Amino acid sequence: MFDYRNHAGIDRAHGFIRGWTVTSAAAHNGTQLRNVVTKDNTASTVWADSAYRSKTNEEWLRDNGLKSDIHQRKPKGKPMPETMSRANGRRSKIRSAVEHVFARQKDKMKLFIRTIGISRARVKIGMANIAYNMLRYVFHEAKRATA
């Protein structure tokens, strides 16, 4: 494997990474939902892109008392209905917070994984996740101090 993926669950209110896992890029996103959604999640709604939508994930969320607000896929061979498009647009406003985390790690923190083996990649990505949370903590503390 030469490419790795960081799957992260983000706290919507404060932007902290609450749960994360690292897989090879070949692994399907949908299988990682249970690893990034923490059981102590105070919010009852889970937002994710359409790769995480499956019957097993929907059942798991329902069984754990969580509401699914996962993007819906376009019907094959048909245009996306307007209502579905608007619903996905509403979801994107919230889900984009996760993309901001990855963008910050890549651009500002210069995260670039050039390791051999997933265990080394996991350590490097894990350290980047911890550093990101520390930056968020400093941001919130500075914001609180000026208030």
PLM region spans:
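Structured core elements
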Residues: 7-9, 21, 47, 69, ...
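Short, charged, surface-exposed secondary-structure boundary motifs
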Residues: 31, 56, 77-84
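Short hydrophobic/aromatic-enriched beta-strand-loop microsegments
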Residues: 64-72
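Short, glycine-/Ser/Thr-/acidic-enriched flexible segments
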Residues: 15, 51-53, 75-76, 132-135
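Short, acidic/turn-prone active-site loops that include or flank metal/cofactor-
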Residues: 22, 72-76
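Basic, amphipathic alpha-helical segments enriched in Lys/Arg and hydrophobic/aromatic residues
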Residues: 59, 64, 86-147
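Short C-terminal domain-edge/linker segments immediately following a structured domain
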Residues: 39-41, 50-52, 76-79, 100-101, ...
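Polybasic low-complexity intrinsically disordered regions
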Residues: 1-64
